[in-house]
Amino acid sequence: MERPCAWKKYTPQQIEELEELCRGYKQFLSENKTERLCVKTGIKMAEEAGYVDLETVIAEGRELKAGDKVYAANHGKDLMLVNLGTAPLEQGFNILGAHVDSPRLDLKQNPAFEAGDMAYLDTHYYGGVKSYHWVASPLALVGVICKKDGTTVDINIGDKEDDPVFTISDLLIHLSSEQMSKPAKDAVDAEILDVIVGGRPVKFDEDDKDAPKEPVKQMFLNNLKEQYDVEEEDFLSAEIEVVPAGPARDMGLDRSMILGYGHDDRVCAYPSMLAQIDVANVERTSITLIVDKEEIGSVGATGMTSRFFENTVAEIMTLAGEDSPLALRRALARSRMLSSDVSAGFDPGYAGKFETKNAAFMGRGLCFNKYTGSRGKGGSNDADAEYVALVRDIMDEAGVDFQTCELGRVNAGGGGTIAYIMAKYGMNVIDSGVAVLSMHALWEVANKADIYEAYRGYKAFLERA
């Protein structure tokens, strides 16, 4: 049951649609390298499409009815878009769910120090990373610093053309014999992933008893104060992420792919939001969820295990006049969901890690993973065969190219998504996303055809499920 390459069927008009979609996606990927920025941009997209903040609806005491479009944000890191359909909410929703946090390095709360006449910022890695990926590459600092007076300072240094960049040094090959003999996981100690941020000391009189003990660090702090009006202590209440510097780019002489940071999982989040916005009138209410903390287990107030989704649905059902606890439970259990997350693209260089009959191939369309997990499907959501059949029918009716796959060979490893968390309500859920190469590396690869088919598939699901 080999699936064909999606590129072979495209008309000139479809190629034009594909390129337009991917131009927007490249801009989104380049400009939104943190979950906060993704949500901020998602809200802007929604408002431009006529969505209204749910908090405004509640404050004004308005009722919700079919055709109304609302959004809700959670701590600036989650976003829920809702398009109310003509069917009673109790009959369930059609849901897309993706995450917008990506593997990265986070600054520690007390990060600044000086060593070897250079200023550094200490980090703690976030998510599943290979430490050796992060050395000797241009890096940017993106995030927020929250001050005691209640103000928030946005930080974004390293992505503009005239910005300085940062880096983590690597050991020169001439002195690396011991390092090169270590397993890859030990070659670069995660504790020494320290970002170089300065190399120039402040001027001072050597006889001055008040001269700074760390003059290069002090110069960095002085620059920070001058440019952003923040003190060293403000790092205690900061969330600054170290991410690769530079934009997403077309890849290949044929420009068929995109190289960028954060395809996992913004390559699913962006087409999900677009599909939600582009679907006009629906019978079953459509919902798109953009969430945080998936890379570390979906925990905390902004992870999928929080009550944000459930609470927001309860608010909406109350405003729509369906406010009984039983109606809420029925609505959740009768819902259908595509858990939109990336899959492992088949890589010929590592062919032994895949089983090709059930592998995701680049350019063959939207991926469906009936189950994920590892070592006997542990920790997975295993979609019902009846639901898989329904999804197949929707995709075929809409002419969407899709493929079914697993995340590598049996016992080769594995992974998980938010699917099992949503399935606890009793709703039907299947994992559905885009195949990528170099997953969790600084620069991941996605095929434009797969992004286009993801958008088409997500839109068809919202309209027809």
Task: Please tell me what each predicted stretch does.
Residues M1-A465:
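N-terminal hydrophobic/helix-forming segments and targeting peptides
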